[in-house]
Regions:
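Beta-alpha junction/loop-to-helix N-cap segments that form part of ligand/metal-binding clefts
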Residues: 24-28, 32, 47-52, 62-135, ...
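An alpha-beta-alpha
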Residues: 141-204, 227, 320
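Extracytoplasmic "Venus flytrap"
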Residues: 36-55, 63, 76-83, 105-106, ...
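Hydrophobic alpha-helical segments within soluble ligand-binding/sensing domains
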Residues: 85, 144-168, 180-182, 212-214, ...
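Segments of small-molecule ligand-sensing domains
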Residues: 300-307, 321-373
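Short, low-complexity disordered leader/linker segments with a strong preference
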Residues: 1-34, 65-66, 380-382
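Extracellular/periplasmic bilobed ligand-binding domains
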Residues: 184-280
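Extracellular/periplasmic periplasmic-binding protein-like sensory domains
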Residues: 241-314, 370, 374-381
Length: 382
């Protein structure tokens, strides 16, 4: 009898162990689908992360279920730091067991998670990381925004055609892949327009978090360029422009999409009047019926006009849910395959088709600071 009991217990334990092994990496069916979000809620990029998350949360309220299951957002602060971004992505995958990830504002932060999502085979959709390297050779990273070769060309064309600029200086943040990359694409396009490789009279650098730009600005001032291109975080860029005006420089200063933040206006004050930058979307020129709905819902929820990053966050969430619905599954690989086939999805920021690199081909908006506000100038098609 004792031998029989021991044998039965051994069989039960063996079956339990086998069941445990079988469930590892393949959690049981749940009534909840978890989507991870890793955005900078603190640090140098906090304003961008906060705007993006507002759009994601609005989309989740608008569409809280898919395939008859509740969609739960798991939001982790990547603290505007590359190491923290990698840690956040790991946590979402290993601990929270998300089936897809949204993020991140800041190309460097997205790139920090690239190998992680690729190895784990959990798809990520970036809202606004514009550096081409984010999705390069990574079938599990997608984005709903344009990329920097286009953005740099848009601003080079503006400088050359609208401002009549024939010389330019570059002031870049060497710690940000976004800033260095976008500067390069501006230079490529601008020198092609001028036909003169010497039309870039200077390229000077600073580091994220710097507060004093007097050395860089003084060196540029002496060269008297027709325009300055200075893509960087909204905080440093606003300070840079303010100090340029304090030095008596009236050279037009252009930037990229990261300038679209309330803090750019509050830090820069009157000094940033006339600043021109490229971005992804404007509430002044809705492009689809979904844009209209998004703008109304955003205003109702937050009591303010929507911005480009909220719109992109909204679209990233909706694109993932569309992929889940088309896949008929919340399996990560199935979602990735459906994302790769996204074509003609109507979003708040426009019609979204993801190309062979996982990139969206989108128009760009050019805004100008006038009267302490961001004012729409024009839309540029790819």
């Amino acid at each position: 009898m004792k031998k029989t009991l021991v044998l039965m217990l051994s069989v039960v334990m063996a079956l339990s162990l086998l069941a445990g092994c079988g469930s590892r990496g393949a959690p049981a069916e749940s009534d909840v689908i978890k989507i991870g979000v890793f955005e900078p809620m603190t640090g140098a990029n906090a304003a961008g992360g906060e705007m993006t998350v507002e759009g994601i949360q609005l989309a989740n309220e608008k569409m809280p279920e898919i395939l008859g299951k509740k969609v739960e957002l798991v939001i982790v602060d990547n603290k505007s730091d590359k190491v923290e971004a990698a840690n956040a992505a790991n946590k979402l995958i290993e601990q929270d067991k998300v089936v897809a990830i949204i993020g991140s504002y800041g190309s460097s932060l997205s790139m920090a998670a690239g190998d992680i999502v690729k190895t784990a085979q959990v798809p990520a959709v970036g809202c606004s990381p514009t550096n081409p390297l984010v999705t390069l050779n990574n079938d599990f990273y997608f984005r709903v925004c344009f990329i920097d070769p286009f953005q740099g060309t848009v601003m080079a064309n503006y400088a050359f055609n609208e401002l009549g600029a024939r010389t330019a200086a570059i002031i870049q943040d060497v710690q940000q892949d976004y800033s260095v990359g976008l500067s390069k694409y501006f230079v490529d396009a601008f020198t092609e327009l001028t036909g003169d490789p010497n039309s870039i009279v200077a390229t000077v650098s600073y580091n994220t978090g710097d507060q004093d730009f007097s050395a860089q600005l003084t060196s540029v001032k002496g060269l008297n360029p027709d325009v300055i291109f200075a893509p960087g975080n909204y905080g440093e860029s606003a300070l840079l422009i303010k100090q340029a005006r304090d030095l008596g420089m009236d050279t037009p200063i252009l930037g990229g999409d990261t300038w679209e933040a309330p803090e750019f206006l509050s830090i820069g004050g009157a000094a940033v009047e006339g600043a021109v930058f490229s971005t992804h979307f404007t509430s002044e020129a809705p492009v689809t019926e979904v844009s209209e709905v998004f703008l109304a819902d955003y205003q109702a929820k937050y009591g303010k006009a929507a911005n480009a990053f909220a719109a992109l966050g909204y679209d990233a969430y909706m694109v993932i849910l569309d992929a889940i619905e088309r896949a008929g599954s919340a399996d990560s690989v199935a979602i990735q395959q459906a994302l790769a086939e996204t074509e003609g999805f109507v979003g708040a920021t426009g019609n979204i088709t993801l190309d062979e690199n996982g990139d969206a081909v989108k128009s760009a908006v050019i805004n100008k600071v006038e009267g302490g506000k961001f004012v729409y100038l024009t839309t540029v098609e790819p």
